[in-house]
């Protein structure tokens, strides 16, 4: 035995080092939440029911809505590059977020195929252990249904992307609607921007996948052009048609530096106004321009910029999407829908 260890000492030490690094990297995917300041709750609408006081006749596009990017990437390896949130999806809803960025892929186990949560090459897991099971679509939907049942004044925007380009698009759509059809009355699946009255207590499907099965009612078409270039451009956001009438403006420069991202984010806040027929998505999230992404380090800077940016009262800024969302960030965004207490 001693001879074996002597002869293989280098290999054994290397294997142990790699194993420890794997454990450390994955453990980092579940801790280190960005601290949020204590806020005066009397100044804010309830995080669980802030939509309650918005008029029924308001289009969901004409509301300032807090959202999270890669919403399920809480427990994921490697955490440094792929972790984008510190709160579970259930906690995000409780803390005021209403737009969820859902990345799914077709997965398999002994019981068959299912849709599991992923971020790029990483699988989003239920708990902060490398041995924890992968998050599944049905489990997260149950959490959302429970939230909406408890808070029927609210709606959840559910933006679904098939993250794996190798997936069979027909199977992906079939699995997705197998889950949706189990509780179809809780969904808004049409291709027109709805009024809030039509979607209270429901999930609004936003589609970033092909309707390969020609189901027809498969939600609003949110298949915007990829914005992964690192180069600065004169027009940093892109417009597409939702249904021939309504428009979608998106700023998602996810490979920009923090400085570039700050500029394009604020530029869109100033220059692209959402309204009844114009939906806007303004991503504050970025992996950065390095070979390895650093979402958390970038979010610590960019989220502070958002919190120190004055948002006018009774003004719609559309949907603002962040990494490492906190209650304070959600409140800062959604309170722009209302008059200031001092006004």
What role is predicted for each listed range?
Residues 61-63, 100-102, 156-158, 205-207, ...:
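Hydrophobic faces of well-ordered beta-strands that scaffold small-molecule active sites
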Residues 129-183:
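Catalytic cores of phosphodiester-bond-cleaving enzymes
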Residues 2-16:
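N-terminal Sec-pathway targeting helices
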Residues 95-100, 151-157, 200-202, 275-277, ...:
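Loop/turn elements at helix/coil->beta-strand transitions in domains of secreted/extracellular proteins
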């Amino acid at each position: 035995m001693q001879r074996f260890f002597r002869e293989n000492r280098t290999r054994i030490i290397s294997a142990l080092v790699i194993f420890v690094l794997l454990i450390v990297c994955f453990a980092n995917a579940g801790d280190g939440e960005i601290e949020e300041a204590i806020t005066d709750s009397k100044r804010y609408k309830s995080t669980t029911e802030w939509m309650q006081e918005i008029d029924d006749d308001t289009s969901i596009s004409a509301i300032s809505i807090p959202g999270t990017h890669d919403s399920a990437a809480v427990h994921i390896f490697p955490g440094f590059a792929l972790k984008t949130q510190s709160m579970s999806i259930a906690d995000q809803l409780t803390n005021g977020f209403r737009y969820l960025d859902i990345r799914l892929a077709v997965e398999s186990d002994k019981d068959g195929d299912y849709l599991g949560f992923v971020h790029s090459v990483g699988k989003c897991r239920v708990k902060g252990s490398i041995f924890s099971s992968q998050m599944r679509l049905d489990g997260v939907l149950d959490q959302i249904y429970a939230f909406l049942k408890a808070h029927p004044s609210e709606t959840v925007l559910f933006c679904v992307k098939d993250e794996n380009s190798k997936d069979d698009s027909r199977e992906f759509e079939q699995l997705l609607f197998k889950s949706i059809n189990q509780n179809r009355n809780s969904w808004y699946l049409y291709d027109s921007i709805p009024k809030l009255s039509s979607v209270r207590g429901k999930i609004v499907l936003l589609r970033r996948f092909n309707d390969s099965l020609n189901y027809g009612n498969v939600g609003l078409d949110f298949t915007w052009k990829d914005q992964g270039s690192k180069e600065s451009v004169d027009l940093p956001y892109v417009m597409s048609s939702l249904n021939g009438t309504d428009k979608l403006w998106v700023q998602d420069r996810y490979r920009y530096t923090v400085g570039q991202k700050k500029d394009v984010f604020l530029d869109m806040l100033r220059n692209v106004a959402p309204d009844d027929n114009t939906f806007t998505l303004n991503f504050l999230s970025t992996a950065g321009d390095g070979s390895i992404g650093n979402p958390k380090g970038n979010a610590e800077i960019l989220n502070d910029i958002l919190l120190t940016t004055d948002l006018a009262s009774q003004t719609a800024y559309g949907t603002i999407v962040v990494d490492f969302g906190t209650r304070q960030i959600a409140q800062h965004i959604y309170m722009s829908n209302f008059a200031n207490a001092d006004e």
